[in-house]
Amino acid sequence: MENKEIVQPWGWELPSTSPFSRTPSRPQHRQPEDFDRKFDSRTIIYDAFYLPERNELRIIGPPFLNLHAMATGVVAISGGETLPVLVQELDRHMRITVQLQGRPDHVVLQSQMGDIRVPITEADQKAFAGKRVLLTLSKNNRLEWICDWIRFHHDHHGANAVLLYDNNSTLYTLHELASAIANVPGIDATRVIHWPYKYGPQGHGGGFWDSDFCQSGALEDARWRYLQPARSVLNVDIDELVLPRHSLCLNWWRQRPPATSRFGDSGWSRRTAVTTAYVQNPSHCCIEVTLYG
């Protein structure tokens, strides 16, 4: 399978000499001991890409939080002209949209944080056109486990493409990962995205899911840079095998109009005869789900 590619997104972080940094929104008494080490205080941009059909530059990153006032005052310059800018703070991520005039080779964002020269790289809208895509963020999951996960969802849900954001794995190279995925029968397209950013602190005491920016940013990036023309997208973790109670996801989706669908598990996970044939990972579980519109 030749349709595989490793992608290095263009990102930007505040230099170590900058007087500015992102500060947490979580109260200090709700921060565990390792919170500061895991918190991403300096990354401003995860990725930037050009959407030709909209003539827009999309910039994805963590939420600005305390830097929001600076961000809303950002100015975009190209060829000496000032361009319209829309800054949106979303759930654990942000999106900047710059309306372009023509297609320059770069845009300069000017703010109190400094000048940022953003290159214009076109979004990949062809690789997953018409595909049923498996989407995930992964770090150091064993290659055989990843391949098990792909085979299961190919056989049971018709997945024929994989978009995997690798969160700086150390057990293998990006090339080894991409090659392993590409060798799974039935997979027509593979993109492995180098996503080296801090994952962020988890929730605390069943709440405060406010600082794990990395995954939300990856999903936003995937949505706009790669998945607009996809036929369907299934986003689950590597240790999750989705087994609906009453029908295959593929058949269920075919009977419904285009939409985003969610599923909830039964409150517990287990292994079944169906999933056991696929898994070499003893911690792999079947998530028994109910599908909703």
Q: Model features per residue range: what roles?
A:
Residues 136-151, 167-168:
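Active-site beta-to-alpha loop of glycosyltransferases that engages the nucleotide-sugar donor
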Residues 121-124, 132-133, 170-235:
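Active-site-proximal specificity loops/subdomain of glycosyltransferases
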Residues 151-160:
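Short, acidic, metal-binding catalytic loop of nucleotide-sugar glycosyltransferases
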Residues 140-142, 169-171, 240-243, 268:
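Short acidic, S/G/P-rich loop/turn micro-motifs used as interaction or catalytic elements
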Residues 163-166, 190-197, 262-266:
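A generic structural motif
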Residues 199-215, 223-225, 234-236, 242-293:
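Conserved catalytic core of nucleotide-sugar-dependent glycosyltransferases
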Residues 105-108, 161-178:
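Carboxylate/His-rich catalytic cores and anion/metal-binding grooves
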Residues 2-124:
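Beta-strand-enriched, solvent-exposed domains that form extended recognition/catalytic surfaces
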